[in-house]
Regions:
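Outer-envelope beta-barrel architecture signal
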Residues: 53-55, 135, 145-149, 161, ...
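Transmembrane beta-barrel wall of Gram-negative outer-membrane proteins
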Residues: 194-318, 333
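Outer-membrane beta-barrel translocator domains and adjoining extracellular loop/strand segments
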Residues: 191-197, 220-227, 246, 256-266, ...
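Feature captures outer-membrane beta-barrel proteins of Gram-negative bacteria and organelles
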Residues: 163-172, 190-208, 228-236, 289-295, ...
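Outer-membrane beta-barrel pore domains and translocons
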Residues: 62, 154-156, 168-170, 182-186, ...
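C-terminal transmembrane beta-barrel domains of outer membrane proteins
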Residues: 93, 377-590
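Periplasmic polypeptide-binding modules associated with outer-membrane biogenesis and secretion
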Residues: 23-160, 165-169, 176, 180-198, ...
Length: 590
C-alpha cells in the first residue's frame, strides 16, 4: 500500500552565512577529486582559484560513461546505455561563453543538474584561461544507467513486504526524456502501469508527466483500483525566473490495507466484550487537482506570491461492515476510518526564502556533493471553502510554516515549525502542529553524528488522519508500522561513518538509537526504544540514493529484546526535515 502511495507521490514529484558565496573554498570527496584529476589530465587545464569576474572563454563538457576504467565491470556494457547529450547538459547551464564568471550562477547550474535523476556526479570546475582575465569552464557529469530496472524493496525478518520494479529508459536518445513501466508487489495486490516524462517539451522550459497504473488483487486476479498523475507546467528553474505555473491531477482509488509487518492490523472496540478483530481494510479514493501561478521577486532574498485553486475529494468506506458488531463498527468509523470530505479552495500564498546554500558531503548520500538551503524559509497560505461551492464544510484554512538553517562547520543545523488550521464548526475543525529539528555535526574522527527530532500533533482531527511508526523508519528493531495514532513523537540519533571507496562504490556504516511512539493524545504516550547497526552504500552507476540495511533490537526495561529484526530498503530511515506542504503538492520536484 505504501509503495503505491510512494509511486504516486513519485509521479507527482516527477511531475513535481553564505558558505557557497564567491571565493569560498570548495571541498571534494576522494571520488570527486579522482574524477577532477583525470579530467584535468584529459583537458590539459589547471584550476583557477579566483575566477570571479573573468570572462568565460569556453565551456568544455565531459560526460562520463556509466562504466569507467576504474570500475570492475567490462566497458562493453556501455553499449546498452544512452549517454546524456552535451547539448542537454549545456541547456541547463545558466551562463554562457562571453559572459562574466558569476559563482552564484555556476552553483545554481550545478544544483539544477544534481536534481536530474539521470546524473549521479556533477562537478563544475573553473580552469585558467588563455590570459589572466579569462577562464575556461569545465563541466563534468556522470550518467546513471539509463536502460534500467529501478528498484525499491522492503524486507523484514527475511520476508518481502514490498517490491517496486520500474523498467524504464530514463534517458531516451540522451535527452533525459523518460518512458517506463511500473510493477509493485504487495502482500495482497500487485500493480502495473506506465509513465512518461518530458522535462523540456519541444525544447522549451515546459515539463510534462503522465502516469497511470492498475491495481489487481493477487488472490482473485480481479482489478480493484488505480492510481496516477498528470502534470503540465513551467517550474521556477532559476533564481531569477519571474513566472512559473502548473496544472496537475493526482488520484488513487484502492482497497486500503494496513499492516503490522506482514500481518493485517486489526481493531478491537472497548465497547464490546470480545475481540472484534476488525481488519484495517477499507475503500479509499482521493482525487486532487491544483492549478496555480507564481510570481517570484528578488535574487538573494526571494519572495514568491502564488495564487490558484485546489480541488480535494476524499472518499472512505469500511468493507464488510455487516460482519462485525454494530457498536464496534461505529467505534472504528469514529476513531480510525478517515473522514469523507470534499474541499474546493481558491488560495493565496506568500513564501520567503534565501538563495544561499551549504555544500556538503555524506549527509543523505555518500561521496557525492549535496546542497542544502541556508537561512530562513517561511510560508503563509490562506484557503477558504464553502458548502455553497461543492465543499463539504464551510471553513477557513490557514497554513503557516517557518524554518531556519545554519551551517555548523562541515555540518548543519535546521529547525522547522508548521501549523495548519481548517477552522469550521467545533466538530468539523481540523488542526495540526508539526515541529522538526536536525543537527548534523562536523566530522568527528571517521564519521559524524546525526540527530533528528519530530513532533506531529493532530490536536483537532476531524479528518481522522492516522500516522504510524515502526521498523521501516524511526523505530528500527520493531515491526514496520507497528504503532498507530493521530500523533507522533520521535527522537533519533545516528553515527554515520565516512564512506570507503571500493572501486567506485561508496560504502559506509551506521550505529543508531531510536525512540518513538504513535499515540492518541499526550496522556497516551509510551515511548519505545530501539538500537542497532546499519550498512549504507551508493552505486554512482545506478543512483544517488543510499541502499541501507539496518539491524535493530527493541530496548525495554529488561534490556535488549532478541532476536531483533533486519530491514532492507533504499533511502535513509528519515530524511532531512523540510517545511511540510500545505496540500498534496505545492512544488515541482525532479
Amino acid at each position: 500500500m505504501k509503495a503505491r502511495r510512494l509511486a504516486l507521490w513519485m509521479g507527482a514529484a516527477l511531475a513535481l552565512h553564505a558558505a557557497t558565496a564567491a571565493g569560498d573554498p570548495v571541498s571534494h570527496s576522494a571520488y570527486e577529486r579522482e574524477t577532477i584529476d583525470a579530467a584535468l589530465e584529459q583537458t590539459g587545464g589547471a584550476i583557477d582559484p579566483s575566477p570571479d569576474g573573468k570572462q568565460i572563454e569556453s565551456i568544455e563538457i565531459i560526460t562520463l560513461e556509466v562504466i569507467e576504467e576504474r570500475d570492475p565491470v567490462p566497458g562493453f556494457f556501455n553499449v546498452f546505455h544512452a549517454t546524456t547529450l552535451k547539448s542537454v547538459i549545456r541547456g541547463e547551464l545558466l551562463f554562457d561563453e562571453g559572459e562574466k564568471y558569476d559563482a552564484r550562477l555556476v552553483q545554481e547550474s550545478a544544483r539544477n543538474l544534481r536534481k536530474r535523476r539521470q546524473l549521479s556526479l556533477v562537478l563544475l570546475v573553473p580552469l585558467r584561461g588563455s590570459s589572466p582575465d579569462k577562464v575556461r569552464m569545465l563541466v563534468i557529469t556522470k550518467d546513471v544507467w539509463s536502460l534500467r530496472l529501478n528498484t525499491n524493496v522492503q524486507i523484514y525478518e527475511g520476508k518481502l513486504l514490498t517490491l517496486l520494479l520500474q523498467p524504464a529508459e530514463e534517458n531516451m536518445f540522451g535527452t533525459h526524456k523518460m518512458l517506463g513501466g511500473l510493477f509493485i508487489l504487495e502482500p495482497d495486490t500487485y500493480s502495473f502501469g506506465g509513465q512518461y516524462m518530458d522535462r523540456r517539451v519541444a525544447g522549451s522550459r515546459l515539463q510534462a508527466v503522465v502516469s497511470a497504473n492498475l491495481i489487481v488483487n493477487r488472490e482473485t486476479g480481479s482489478p480493484e483500483g488505480s492510481f496516477g498523475t498528470l502534470f503540465y507546467g513551467q517550474p521556477q528553474y532559476a533564481v531569477e525566473t519571474k513566472w512559473s505555473w502548473k496544472a496537475m491531477v493526482v488520484w488513487y482509488d484502492e482497497i486500503f490495507r494496513s499492516y503490522v509487518g506482514t500481518d493485517l492490523r486489526r481493531y478491537d472496540s472497548p465497547a464490546t466484550p470480545g475481540d472484534d478483530r476488525i481488519p484495517y481494510v477499507y475503500d479509499a479514493a482521493r482525487w486532487f487537482s491544483a492549478y496555480s501561478v507564481t510570481r517570484s521577486f528578488g535574487r538573494e532574498l526571494k519572495h514568491d506570491v502564488s495564487t490558484g485553486v485546489e480541488i480535494d475529494r476524499r472518499r472512505f468506506r469500511l468493507r464488510d461492515a455487516q460482519s462485525f458488531a454494530p457498536a464496534a463498527v461505529r467505534d472504528f468509523t469514529r476513531q480510525e476510518l478517515p473522514v469523507t470530505d470534499t474541499r474546493v479552495s481558491p488560495f493565496l500564498q506568500l513564501r520567503s526564502y534565501t538563495s544561499h546554500y551549504h555544500r556538503v558531503h555524506d549527509f543523505e548520500t555518500l561521496g557525492l556533493e549535496e546542497d542544502f538551503r541556508l537561512g530562513h524559509e517561511a510560508v503563509v497560505r490562506v484557503y477558504p471553502a464553502s458548502s455553497e461551492v461543492a465543499s463539504t464544510r464551510d471553513m477557513l484554512g490557514t497554513h503557516a510554516a517557518l524554518g531556519y538553517t545554519l551551517p555548523f562547520g562541515s555540518g548543519i543545523a535546521r529547525a522547522v515549525a508548521a501549523s495548519t488550521i481548517e477552522k469550521s464548526t467545533r466538530a468539523a475543525t481540523d488542526a495540526t502542529l508539526q515541529l522538526g529539528t536536525r543537527v548534523v555535526t562536523p566530522r568527528v574522527g571517521f564519521g559524524r553524528f546525526v540527530y533528528d527530532g519530530l513532533l506531529i500533533s493532530h490536536y483537532e482531527n476531524y479528518l481522522n488522519d492516522q500516522l504510524t511508526v515502526g521498523g521501516d523508519g524511526r523505530l528500527r528493531g520493531y515491526a514496520p508500522k507497528q504503532f498507530i495514532g493521530k500523533d507522533v513523537l520521535a527522537s533519533n540519533l545516528e553515527f554515520r561513518t565516512r564512506p570507503v571507496q571500493v572501486w567506485s562504490v561508496q560504502v559506509g556504516g551506521a550505529v543508531f538509537y531510536d525512540t518513538a511512539d504513535a499515540f492518541d493524545g499526550f496522556s497516551d504516550v509510551r515511548m519505545k526504544h530501539g538500537t542497532g547497526i546499519g550498512l549504507r552504500s551508493v552505486f554512482p552507476q545506478a543512483e544517488r540514493i543510499v541502499f541501507r540495511a539496518d539491524y535493530g533490537v527493541p530496548v525495554t526495561d529488561k534490556g535488549f529484546t532478541f532476536p531483533g529484526s533486519l530491514f532492507i530498503a533504499f533511502g535513509q530511515a528519515f530524511g532531512m526535515p523540510t517545511l511540510p506542504a500545505p496540500s498534496l503538492e505545492t512544488d515541482y520536484r525532479e
